[in-house]
């Protein structure tokens, strides 16, 4: 568990650290003070693109990740949306993709529990969420390491399956 005030402080520090700005996959980073979250727009990894072509027979355009805080679990919460490339009558467009087997597509079977949710404070939009139920066991919540909780959480819940390379 991470108290809300600590989460808020660490989120700002994480944003200021430029770790996402320097990430090769990251196209855009936006800190949303009103909604108390961090929005990332990512290019898909080669592996994710291959999985999508194989499993869904589609091309990806980008991935959206939204880091927010679960007041129910007192933990960080990762939300995800996948956007596919589509062409209708020769006009290119992007469309929200709702794969039937998201765990296989992301190659996170057995690592994380994902579910499809409607997020009220994000205009009622549909997102996949990485369920925060076992987060403190996965990340470790000893008091002496609390100052690095969010950074460790990001390395597990984001970089462990997407990888990290500086741009």
Curated annotation (Swiss-Prot):
GO biological process: one example: cytoplasm to vacuole targeting by the Cvt pathway
Cross-referenced InterPro entries: Atg10, Atg3/Atg10
UniProt keyword list: Autophagy, Membrane, Protein transport, Transferase, Transport, Ubl conjugation pathway
Similarity field: Belongs to the ATG10 family.
Subunit structure: Forms homooligomers. Interacts with ATG7 and ATG12.
Gene (name only): ATG10
Taxonomic path: Eukaryota, Fungi, Dikarya, Ascomycota, Saccharomycotina
Active-site residues from the entry: 133
Gene Ontology cellular component list: phagophore assembly site membrane
Effect noted on mutating residue 26 to S: No effect on conjugating activity. Normal autophagic activity
Membrane topology (UniProt): Peripheral membrane protein
Protein purpose: E2-like enzyme required for the cytoplasm to vacuole transport (Cvt), autophagy and nucleophagy. Acts as an E2-like enzyme that catalyzes the conjugation of ATG12 to ATG5. ATG12 conjugation to ATG5 is required for proper localization of ATG8 to the preautophagosomal structure (PAS). Likely serves as an ATG5-recognition molecule.
Places the protein is found: Preautophagosomal structure membrane
Keyword flag Transferase: yes
E.C. no: 2.3.2.-
Molecular-function GO term, any one: Atg12 transferase activity
Protein name per Swiss-Prot or TrEMBL: Ubiquitin-like-conjugating enzyme ATG10
């Amino acid at each position: 568990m991470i108290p809300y005030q600590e989460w808020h402080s660490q989120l700002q520090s994480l944003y200021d650290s430029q770790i996402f700005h320097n990430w090769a996959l990251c196209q855009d980073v936006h800190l949303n003070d009103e909604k108390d979250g961090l929005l990332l727009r990512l290019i898909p990894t080669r592996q994710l693109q291959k999985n999508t072509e194989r499993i869904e027979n589609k091309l990806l355009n980008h991935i959206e990740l939204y880091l927010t805080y679960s007041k129910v679990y007192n933990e960080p919460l990762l939300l995800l949306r996948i956007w596919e490339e589509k062409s209708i009558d020769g006009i290119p467009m992007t469309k929200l993709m709702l794969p039937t087997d998201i765990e296989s597509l992301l190659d996170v079977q057995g690592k994380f529990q994902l579910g499809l949710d409607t997020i009220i404070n994000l205009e009622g939009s549909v997102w996949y969420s990485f369920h925060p139920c076992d987060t403190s066991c996965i990340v470790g919540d000893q008091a002496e390491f609390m100052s690095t909780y969010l950074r460790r959480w990001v390395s597990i819940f984001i970089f462990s399956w997407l990888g990290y390379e500086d741009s």
